Structures are given as structure tokens and as C-alpha cells.
């Protein structure tokens, strides 16, 4: 790669980021981060009318159908929310479970969650590591307290983790809330931490309505044995990526990006080339006969 093609500029976002976004010689900006910062970047980019690609926050819904395979679904559901300590934009943070299996799903999720080993990230036996900083830890604990205050049932976790090897780091117990309603703060705002909200539904229409009742639309999912039914429901969820019976699956040939306040544009797939290129139309006339130029008759 020739010198200058790739440049790494480090520094605080408020300084380096602002300089890049507002500079006239920068014609395209791609950003991955919070919706709040994404909105600011979009507003700044308007000053020079530059293209932006924004991959922002999420509050991913996962609809659990009554016919799920518990043995495979339960651990995969937990991977969807607790991977990377929940610090993943597409994390499955809203689990929408049919009322007929709600209690058993919550019970099995809690039992499996209590087996997750917290520890240092470089330890191969670690199941979940710490969150990124003290401020993020305190923010997550604040959301957990708001869930308790609003009446959600704390099933497991909910505290800063302690124990051997956990004192040097910002560890939070993997947390599950049951009896969550979609108007609660923990169900509406991106927590970016190891917190799962379990909601209940009666009908398919209600499940889809809950899933789509969000400012976000980055990802979503459906769990169930009937793949045809799951695919049908997937088409009705307003999100850029939908997983069926799995989570966090990416391919370089499959586009990734969000609906609504989860972003603009797509990364990966053929679509990404349009995000980083401009379309040009070059029209060349090969005739020397004015008679073959009908527009001339409008002027002469």
C-alpha cells in the first residue's frame, strides 16, 4: 500500500473527530458508535455536504416462538446478549417470549447464566470479561437500578462482581430482568452492557409490535423450530439484519447496517462499494449531423 493511503490519527473524538468531519478535503465519513454521536457527526457533515455512513446503537429484539429447541436456543440466546460483556451494538437485549413458555425460558436462562465464569479476558476459561471503563460500569449499574425502580423483576445478577481475580477490573454480573414492559427505560435505551430484558407476548402480532416499538433497528432475531414461520416473522421486523436460531453471524458478502436511528448506509456486501464511490454519467455524441440532434430545434 503506498504511503499516505491509510493514515491513523489518534486523539479524543471531540478534537480529532471534529477536525475530520468538518474538513473540506474529507469527502466521506464512516462512523461506528453511539446514536448520540452519530447525530452530531451527521449535523457537522452537512456543513460540507459530505457522504456519511453511520453504524449506530441498537436495542435488538429476539422473538421466541413456543416451539423452540431449548437445548440449542438457551445458550445461543445468552451468547447473543452477553458476548463481549454486552458491549456490542447488535446485542440481543430484548427477548420477547411467548406466554406459554415464558416461565421455563426465564428459569433456564437464569440457571445457565449463573454458570458463566467471569474472569480476565486472556484466560481461555473465561466466559465473560469486564466492561471497558469505570464510567461505563456505573452507567450500566444505573440502568439496572432503574429497572428495579420501575418494577422489573431482577432474576439474577444486578451487581458489580467480586471474588478472586475480579478486583482488578470493572466486572458486572450478567443480569436478567423478567416481567419487563416495553415502556421501561431498560427496554428502550441502549445499555451497552450485560443486561437482558425478557418481555412476554400472547399473539404473533403483539410480538412483532413490541419488536418494532423502538427507535432502533440495527438487528433482530427469531427463535423457533418452524423455520418457514420464523422467516415470515423476520420479514416483518424493522431491522437491517435478522438472525434465525443464531446470533452474531457475519459474512463479508452480506450487508450490515441499521434502520431508523441505528444508522445510515451499509457495510460489507456489494452495497458497501456504493458508500465509498461516486456515480458519474459521461455522455458522448458520435454524430456530426445536426438533423440527428433534435434538441437543436428548440433553439434554432
Describe the role of every protein-language-model region.
Residues 17-18, 208:
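Short hydrophobic/charged patches on amphipathic alpha-helices used for structural packing
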Residues 22, 34-181, 244, 291-292, ...:
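ALDH superfamily catalytic-core signature
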Residues 13-16, 58, 202-204:
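Short helix-initiation/N-cap motifs at beta->coil->alpha
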Residues 1-17:
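PLP-dependent aminotransferase-like
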Residues 26, 63, 117, 128-129, ...:
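Conserved C-terminal structural/oligomerization subdomain of aldehyde/semialdehyde dehydrogenase
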Residues 5-7, 51-53, 94, 153, ...:
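Residues at or immediately flanking beta-strands
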Residues 28-32:
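Periplasmic-binding protein-like
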Residues 14-15, 36-37, 47, 228-229, ...:
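Short alpha-helical
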Amino acid at each position: 500500500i503506498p504511503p499516505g493511503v491509510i493514515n491513523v490519527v489518534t486523539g479524543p473524538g471531540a478534537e480529532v473527530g471534529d477536525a475530520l468531519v468538518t474538513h473540506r478535503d474529507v469527502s466521506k465519513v464512516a462512523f461506528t458508535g453511539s446514536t448520540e454521536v452519530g447525530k452530531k457527526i451527521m449535523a457537522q457533515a452537512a456543513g460540507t455536504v459530505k457522504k456519511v455512513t453511520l453504524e449506530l446503537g441498537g436495542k435488538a429484539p429476539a422473538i421466541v416462538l413456543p416451539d423452540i429447541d431449548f437445548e440449542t436456543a438457551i445458550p445461543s440466546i445468552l451468547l447473543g446478549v452477553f458476548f463481549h460483556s454486552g458491549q456490542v451494538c447488535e446485542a440481543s437485549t430484548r427477548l420477547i417470549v411467548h406466554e406459554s413458555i415464558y416461565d421455563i425460558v426465564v428459569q433456564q436462562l437464569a440457571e445457565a447464566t449463573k454458570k458463566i465464569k467471569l474472569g480476565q479476558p486472556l484466560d481461555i476459561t473465561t466466559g465473560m470479561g469486564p466492561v471497558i471503563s469505570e464510567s461505563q460500569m456505573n452507567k450500566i449499574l444505573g440502568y439496572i437500578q432503574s429497572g428495579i425502580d420501575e418494577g422489573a423483576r431482577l432474576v439474577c445478577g444486578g451487581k458489580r462482581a467480586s471474588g478472586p481475580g475480579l478486583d482488578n477490573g470493572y466486572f458486572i454480573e450478567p443480569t436478567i430482568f423478567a416481567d419487563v414492559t416495553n415502556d421501561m427505560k431498560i427496554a428502550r435505551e441502549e445499555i451497552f452492557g450485560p443486561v437482558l430484558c425478557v418481555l412476554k407476548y400472547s399473539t404473533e402480532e403483539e410480538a412483532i409490535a413490541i419488536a418494532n416499538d423502538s427507535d432502533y433497528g440495527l438487528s433482530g432475531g427469531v427463535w423457533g423450530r418452524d423455520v418457514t414461520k420464523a422467516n415470515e416473522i423476520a420479514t416483518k421486523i424493522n431491522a437491517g439484519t435478522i438472525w434465525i436460531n443464531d446470533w452474531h453471524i457475519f459474512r463479508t458478502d452480506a450487508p450490515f447496517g441499521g434502520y431508523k436511528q441505528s444508522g445510515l448506509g451499509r457495510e460489507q456486501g456489494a452495497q458497501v462499494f456504493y458508500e465509498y464511490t461516486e456515480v458519474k454519467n459521461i455522455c458522448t455524441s458520435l454524430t456530426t449531423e445536426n438533423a440527428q440532434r433534435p434538441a437543436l430545434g428548440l433553439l434554432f
